[in-house]
């Protein structure tokens, strides 16, 4: 998945669940700057651990986070 698609997908999920970047970063236990860079497309290949943390914060699987479901 490209960083643009991941960025778009995270934004879609944040809007769906009505959660701010700050709240998502805290819930996922990742630095706000990391999440902001992923959403802006500046981090093309976030680690699997980061993807899992973000997916868990949304209560979805990594496949759904990546738009595969």
PLM features: residue spans?
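A short, Lys/Arg-rich alpha-helix, primarily the initiator
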Residues: 1-16
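Key DNA-contacting residues within the recognition helix of helix-turn-helix
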Residues: 11, 36-37, 66
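Residue-level detection of the helix-turn-helix DNA-binding "recognition helix"
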Residues: 11, 15, 29, 40
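Alpha-helical residues within the helix-turn-helix
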Residues: 15, 26, 56
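Short alpha-helical DNA-recognition segment
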Residues: 19-37
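Conserved short acidic donor-positioning loop in nucleotide-sugar-dependent glycosyltransferases
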Residues: 41, 68
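DNA major-groove recognition helix of helix-turn-helix/homeodomain DNA-binding modules
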Residues: 49-64
């Amino acid at each position: 998945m490209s960083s643009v698609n991941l960025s778009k997908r995270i934004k879609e999920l944040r809007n769906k669940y009505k959660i701010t970047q700050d709240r998502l970063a805290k819930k996922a236990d990742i630095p706000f700057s990391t999440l902001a860079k992923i959403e802006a497309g500046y981090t093309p290949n976030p680690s699997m651990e980061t993807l899992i943390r973000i997916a868990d914060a949304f209560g979805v699987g990594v496949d759904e986070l990546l738009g595969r479901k």
